[in-house]
Amino acid sequence: MILDDIVGVKKKELEIRKESKPLKDIVDELSRIDEFKIRNFKGALINDDISIIGEIKRASPSKGIIDRKFEFEDICSTYETLDIDAVSVLTEQHYFKGKDEYLKKAKEFISKPVLRKDFIVDEYQVYESKLLGADAVLLIVRILKENLDKFYKIASSIGLQCIVEVHNKSELDIALKIEPEIIGINNRNLENFTVDLKNTENLINYMPENTAVISESGIKTSMDFKYIKSLPINGVLIGEGLMKKIYDIESIKKFIDSVKSG
């Protein structure tokens, strides 16, 4: 299964990272930084209109390479000028061709809140995310299970907000036990990467009133947006739909306008 492969590679990668830079060194480095410019990710989702999280994504297991040029600074410049509310940056190296450096640069070039999008399997990555400049991290229930509460508390203790990601009702039940501020409903099944937009509709009615809800994955056409906007959600995460238009500023602005206008 794809998710098992990703997690396996991530754990091996972390063994090397920890040898190169132990967790203690990261914590010590964090303690020496006087001030972090943390931006309010949840605040960016609380709007009268639907909020848009634009994702910077070079590749994916299902689509392969999405952007062969991947002129990162140009992408950041475009995202800064677009009418979007936050940015998600893929840092997973092997399957999504991301880099930690992309997160650091995005925080430098973009004034909007920045999410580190990766497959967090170890508390090391939570502290690392803070050091890289993330405002929020993604915690995937299917990966973390009983460790979800622990990782959520660690992130909160160092000033990071979390998107707690679920795909089905059993995962949502686990998530709701920790009363998260933000829940992401992934329309993509991480076991086989198939997509069903009905997933958001199936889970939305179980959400607590004060929880910000994001619909993730598979939102590409005007009909998709019209359908998703009919649901009581706060925001959408759009990756491929933006990245395929990223170098055509007029086209991408029309695309964003169509999402906002519904």
From Swiss-Prot:
Coiled coil: none annotated. Signal peptide: none annotated. The keyword Ion transport does not apply. GO terms for biological process: L-tryptophan biosynthetic process. GO terms for molecular function: indole-3-glycerol-phosphate synthase activity; phosphoribosylanthranilate isomerase activity. It comes from the Bacteria. Its EC number is 4.1.1.48. Keywords: Amino-acid biosynthesis, Aromatic amino acid biosynthesis, Decarboxylase, Lyase, Tryptophan biosynthesis. PROSITE patterns: IGPS. It catalyses: 1-(2-carboxyphenylamino)-1-deoxy-D-ribulose 5-phosphate + H(+) = (1S,2R)-1-C-(indol-3-yl)glycerol 3-phosphate + CO2 + H2O. InterPro entries: Aldolase_TIM, Indole-3-glycerol_P_synth, Indole-3-glycerol_P_synth_dom, Indole-3-GlycerolPSynthase_CS, RibuloseP-bd_barrel. Pathway: Amino-acid biosynthesis; L-tryptophan biosynthesis; L-tryptophan from chorismate: step 4/5. NCBIfam families: PRK00278.2-4. Belongs to the TrpC family. This is Indole-3-glycerol phosphate synthase. The lineage of its organism: Bacteria, Bacillati, Bacillota, Clostridia, Eubacteriales.
